[in-house]
């Protein structure tokens, strides 16, 4: 089948790594792909305007699940957290300084890189809104995060209701 440039790049990189091992082990004499060049096809990032974020925050949603997905998306917008880091976020990761500022201290799951994020009032409000909320993996979790696919589908529907034509996902 056909695959995109980024997928082709990732598969080529994997194959190149295997071939390096093959040369090192003496299974082949030389690396056949040394001169082969391939680059991923980077897509430009999509950003929401302040007005679009406000529309998402203001829209009346009938169902609890829709409101929760919208709120988690807004939280990610104001913190920059990736889906998996949102899913893994627990109350233990939230620290209040002596001056009253709140921060998230944790490590990115994808890279293991430590991070700390100062929480703006909107993010703090969302954390409090979901304290004691049913449907979480366990009570230590901050948000009732479900699978990524259903979150993406739901946020796309909400964006459509708001008249936002940008292709939203948990990556934005």
Where are these regions (language model features)?
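Active-site-proximal segment of tyrosine recombinases
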Residues: 85-87, 167-170
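Conserved tyrosine-mediated DNA breakage-rejoining catalytic core shared by Y-recombinases
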Residues: 37-46, 50-52, 79, 88-129
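Alpha-helix C-caps/helix-loop-beta hinges
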Residues: 18-21, 25, 92
């Amino acid at each position: 089948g056909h695959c995109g440039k980024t997928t082709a790049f990732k598969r080529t990189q994997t194959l190149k790594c295997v071939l390096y091992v093959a040369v090192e082990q003496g299974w082949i004499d030389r690396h056949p792909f040394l001169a082969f060049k391939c680059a991923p096809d980077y897509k430009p990032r999509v950003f929401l305007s302040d007005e679009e974020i406000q529309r998402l925050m203001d829209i009346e949603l009938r169902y609890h699940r829709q409101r929760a997905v919208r709120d988690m998306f807004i939280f990610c917008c104001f913190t920059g957290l990736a889906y998996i880091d949102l899913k893994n976020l627990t109350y233990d990761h939230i620290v209040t300084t002596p001056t009253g500022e709140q921060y998230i201290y944790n490590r990115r799951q994808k890279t293991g890189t430590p991070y700390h994020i100062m929480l703006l009032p909107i993010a703090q409000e969302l954390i409090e809104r979901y304290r004691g909320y049913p449907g979480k993996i366990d009570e230590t979790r901050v948000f009732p995060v479900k699978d990524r696919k259903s979150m993406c589908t739901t946020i796309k529907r909400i964006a459509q209701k708001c008249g936002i034509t940008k292709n939203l996902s948990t990556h934005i």
